Amino acid sequence: MSAQRLNAAERDLEKFIKFLVLKSTQVVVQSRLGEKMQTQCNPLAGSDWFNIAVQDHPEVLDETKRALNLKTGESILQRLPLCVEISLKTTEGDQMVLEVWSLDLLQPQNGASPATNDLNPEGQTLKAAHAIYNRMGIMLKSLISLTRTTPAYKLSRRQCPDSYGIFYRIYVDRPQVHTLGEGHKHVKIGQLSTIVGSLVMSVAYRTKLTISPTAAQSESNTIMLKSDHFRPATDANTPGNQQQTQNGTVVAKKLGLGALNPAQGTADRRFIDIEKPLRPGAFTDMGKLKQYTEDDFVLPETPPFEWLLRGRGSVESLNRLDNNSVASVNISNNNNSTQDSKFNQISNLNNNSAGFKSFEKNSENSVSPIKSLLIPASATATYRHHSEPSLQPPPDDDNLLKELHFPFASPTSHVNDLAKFYRECYHAPPLKGLNELQAEISSISSTPPASSGSGGVAACGPTAAATAIATSSADASAMDDLSRQLEQFETSLEDYDKLVSQFGLTGSSSTGSRSSGGLQMSN
């Protein structure tokens, strides 16, 4: 009777161990899916093994049963240890084993069970069965907690099809810890003593997460091979797959939210041969194809975009033109010092405009559709500097050559109006100030009139009368010009305000034309 009870207790323990193995593989694999597991509280927990709600994944359950390969009447104690291997595989094809979970059964020494030595073996065996069932539940809870603490859990949460994926493999054999590299750690999750032996649950995980292709090679392999010597095998009859399917092992399966296509990782990579000539497309006229030679690939000695650079001849011609205009203005000023100032201003303006037009004719061969704005030193500025010797002239600065380029402007762009306005403002004749007018009037009035020596009475000859008339006419004309200019400025005050406001906001082309007209009115 006691032997029958003992056999029944052993069968119950074998049943408990079988479901512990199935639930352990489910816990390990589901923890590497890359998502958090949420289970609802079940008030009727009688149907849940070990009082833990662990949903069975059909694929994992089939892989576990295929690895155990239990036959009819065969005990699961003979198929232990069972291992679950978690590995990482990158998109480049590099693979690295992260951890190995194992559940092993250590047989009792001398073939004696601890329950047969007691006085009441039947009662001790029944109590041990219930205690073992509760201890198995505690061991399974410890496994759930520990699967979230290893480095592979963080890697599984970050997996994506573009970088790497997590795979699992279930096999019946001793844990292959040599694939974990140097410095791996081994942790014992729990140990449970039963009448059939001691159940030991442990994990060995990798600490160095650096992928090295030569880490998994054996020491005896000293043959140097090319990097692309081994091709990914797609046939199940290849030696690599046959080695994996021995001893009840199975091929590693893909984990994650969505499994990839099996042919995706095993497809041959396509390589592009640069030296191979390109083939023409369909319906191509072979006569129109250009045959390239080695001369077409020789880079020219001249720098690229040289045509955008301004030639030295244009600057030299501009300098010569500027020097000639300044010299001619100085000669004319020395010869005609008694002429009217208004006539001098008009002649200087004509000289400047003629010089600018001649420069534009010389620069007609420019490639850019918008001509660059080149402004030479005006003769009017030279005239003002000669008339005011007290002021220091500005530095030469390449003869006051100012240059503005618009290489990317279209012919209809508003930048032409801006250049025209700037050119007219730069060449505008200078206005005489009040100090200059007062100096001329005082110089004329300070000239003493001619007197006769006999009676002391002023002579009223034609020379004195002409001098007085010229003095009065000069004063009247100067005052008339000044009053006329002031009236024009006052009447055009609104236009100047609009001009200033438009320059501050938009700077349109109409502003330039109106402002240039206002400046021309001041002549």
From Swiss-Prot:
Post-translational modification summary for this protein: Phosphorylated in a nutrient-, TOR- and Atg1 kinase-dependent manner.
Phenotype on disruption: Results in late stage egg chambers that contain persisting nurse cell nuclei without fragmented DNA and attenuation of caspase-3 cleavage.
Gene3D superfamilies named in the record: HORMA domain
GO cellular component term, pick one: Atg1/ULK1 kinase complex
Alphabetical UniProt keywords: Autophagy, Cytoplasm, Phosphoprotein
Keyword Phosphoprotein: yes
Pfam families: ATG13
Main location: cytoplasm
Keyword Secreted: no
Region (Disordered): 504-523
Subunit structure: Interacts with Atg1.
Function as written in the Swiss-Prot or TrEMBL entry: Autophagy factor required for autophagosome formation. Target of the TOR kinase signaling pathway that regulates autophagy through the control of the phosphorylation status of Atg13 and Atg1. The Atg1-Atg13 complex functions at multiple levels to mediate and adjust nutrient-dependent autophagic signaling. Involved in the autophagic degradation of dBruce which controls DNA fragmentation in nurse cells.
Name used for this protein in its record: Autophagy-related protein 13 homolog
Organism: Drosophila melanogaster
Lineage: Eukaryota, Metazoa, Ecdysozoa, Arthropoda, Hexapoda
Gene that this polypeptide is encoded by: Atg13
